[in-house]
Amino acid sequence: ILVIDATSGVTTQDKKIAGLIQEAKKPAIIALNKWDLVANGREKDPELLREHTERIRAELFFLSYAPVVILSALTGTNVKRLFTMVEKVRQHSTRRAGTGELNRVLKAAMERQAPPTRGNRRFKVLYAAQAKESSRSPVQAPLFVMFVNDPKLIPDSYVNYLCARIRDKWEFPGLPILMRLRGREGAPTEVA
């Protein structure tokens, strides 16, 4: 849980910590604390909530998968919502995408926006499946393995596009999507 002081907004230190979370590919929830001091009696004002959430999202755009919970630890406002979100992230970490449906989602995404070509070669997905991470952590990010013709043909931006389509289909709040590409030679390449 990345706790941000609502009175000071996202600081340089907050950005560094968020960057470490993103680099380590860890689950995350952003808690905007001290809401009582910012809201001045307008705690439930939807416009104020939206404005602050959008500002956080803009500054921490690289943690787009992390839900934002606005709360006040002092008054107890939305503290239960934070714990509910922690449980939701944990539950979704066990969600499995069926192989057939995953392949249909990826095929539709590639038909909607074809992968770029390198020279006269085009990236092709032979098939994809969700794998189980061998971590002992109780909350694991979903790991997808794509068996492809050549992992070197796909730019990171296109992997991000495919991860976004997976996220559109299956809700994985607070969880980064991990993608491994395996070429015909079998050596895995972790991309996203």
Where are the regions that the model predicts?
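C-terminal-of-GTPase-core extension/linker across diverse P-loop GTPases
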Residues: 2-3, 8-192
